[in-house]
Amino acid sequence: KTNELGGLFLTASAMSFKENDKELIEWYKKEVAKQGIDIRFNTEVTDLGTMRGFDEIIVATGSVPRTMPMIPGFEKTMSFTELLKEKKEVGDKVLFFGGGQSSCEAAYDLILQGKHPIIVEYAGDLVAAQATCLANTSFLRDAMEYHKVPTYLHSTITEIHDGGVTVKGQDGKTFEVACDNVINGIGFVPAPVGDKGRHVHRVGDCVAIGNLRTVIWRAWDVCMKI
């Protein structure tokens, strides 16, 4: 539905140290062009019933950021796409609501720019999700510690306001953390279109939130069955 190929991988590869990911996207673009695949840019499908004349349909509509509208001021948060791909301007102190791999990588990218990130994470550790590459998790945790990134574990945000957030710690007490911007790092949720069927298949994040490896494997599996 946009004017370019890549989906959320464009955002994930936008950081300064993701040269290999950028090269992979360019390789895929060249392969698509080489195979003469018909691409309809700026075209969104909201109803699979409009897709006529196809033997098989593969839905790869990805995911959207998880939201928590019950938190006052949540609408003030910035998405990863706005921060990394669209390069929206941020201040010196950038707070990440969530301490997963995406948040830690983006925080490291900001450190390289001379910014001062802050992380608020509900779990007891950073990059706590399972099935994450140990080399990545170890480096990111070490990098956050080395650069003395203020990190609040076992904590959540109860309100977002101009100039900072209200954080609730494990002991139930609240305190204020000053920041210039808040990044929504609480994850993504699948955004499929239509229902699965005998000739309708889903791949990528619209099935379940994964990583580059899982989405490629899922696409391969579906294509081999077709």
Pin down the residues of each PLM region.
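Residues that recognize and position ribonucleotide moieties
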Residues: 150, 158, 175-177
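Rossmann-like dinucleotide-binding cores of NAD(P)H-dependent redox enzymes
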Residues: 1-35, 107-156
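Generic beta-strand structural signal
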Residues: 159-160, 202
